[in-house]
Amino acid sequence: MAPTAVYTQKDSPSSSQPSSKGPALAIGSLETAQDGKYQSLITELEATRQVDKLLLDRLVDGATTLEPSKYNSVHVTLASSDYQSLQESTLRSLLTQLLTGLTPLGTLHLLNLTDGLKTLPSELTLSGFLVLSAAGENPGDSIVAQKPAHAIGASVSLKKRGSATTTSTTAFVTTTTTTSTSTTTATVTSAPSVPLLLRKRGDPAKKKALWALTTDASASPSTKIDADALLTAEDKARPVPTCAPVDRSAPRRKKACKNCSCGLAELEEEEKRNAPVVVIDSSIDGEGGAKAVDKAERERLLEAAKNAPKATSSCGSCFLGDAFRCAGCPYLGLPAFKPGEKVEIDFGMDDF
């Protein structure tokens, strides 16, 4: 019986096999297409992966949009004038579009940078990228940025201890093929899932003890401090309102308070007694004039008005006020008064 040879089939490289690297996007401009930099970038990338080609103005003008999470890498080669125009207008919106088109952990390569783009790393960070390598000071340097593994705002479920594990498993298949029997044996191994555990809650009794009013272990938990027991008789006594003595040179208060004890009430009464008085009389200037009189004259006029006969009026309405007076009334402009009394207006009145 002839011996049987057993061969293990191995995958041999073939030119028809797709590359291990994911699809890439090459972005250029008219200037880089004319000087050959864009074509060189495409030739270099097509050797190892599938490459989609796009010009910058298509993205900036909104003529096309990128499919979400399609490209493993995006390579941008622009001229210095293109970078300057982007920095002044639509750089933030372009970076947002590129972030959308990249897969998680995909990389963005900005090539042929100039030394004037100092704010580009900060713009990448604000757009959601992680800057892996920054450009140097030499013209032609590049910046490499990466899209985070999780998008901003992505939710991750947290399961408590003892809950069911996830149902999704990863299968590893090992295949062995023999040429004599043409049989295939497959072994499937499921990768164990690791649940995410929440933080264990603390002891409620320990937390409650932190807010206890007493640290004495023998004391009752219901023991409370009586706030009234901490006050003395002096604390409970109603304070007597007092004010500082009045100072004639300092600015005074508007008015003395009730039951004033600082002397302001007496000062106001004294000023009222000694204040000058203006007497308005129709006998002055023939039209009802005004003159200032002292205290003695004021008292004399008051006494004279009290003893004088009642005043008379040709129309009988002079004493009722301006609404009842004629145009030539000598009392025009004066307040209403009783017949025979003098009208007095103090210097402190606002309507004089």
From Swiss-Prot:
Component of the cytosolic iron-sulfur (Fe-S) protein assembly (CIA) machinery required for the maturation of extramitochondrial Fe-S proteins. Part of an electron transfer chain functioning in an early step of cytosolic Fe-S biogenesis, facilitating the de novo assembly of a [4Fe-4S] cluster on the scaffold complex CFD1-NBP35. Electrons are transferred to DRE2 from NADPH via the FAD- and FMN-containing protein TAH18. Residues 1-11 have a biased composition (Polar residues). It comes from Coprinopsis cinerea (strain Okayama-7 / 130 / ATCC MYA-4618 / FGSC 9003). Residues 315-329 are annotated as: Fe-S binding site B. The keyword Endoplasmic reticulum does not apply. HAMAP family: Anamorsin. Keywords: 2Fe-2S, 4Fe-4S, Cytoplasm, Iron, Iron-sulfur, Metal-binding, Mitochondrion. Residues 196-237 are annotated as: Linker. Signal peptide: none annotated. It is found in: Cytoplasm; Mitochondrion intermembrane space. This is Fe-S cluster assembly protein DRE2.
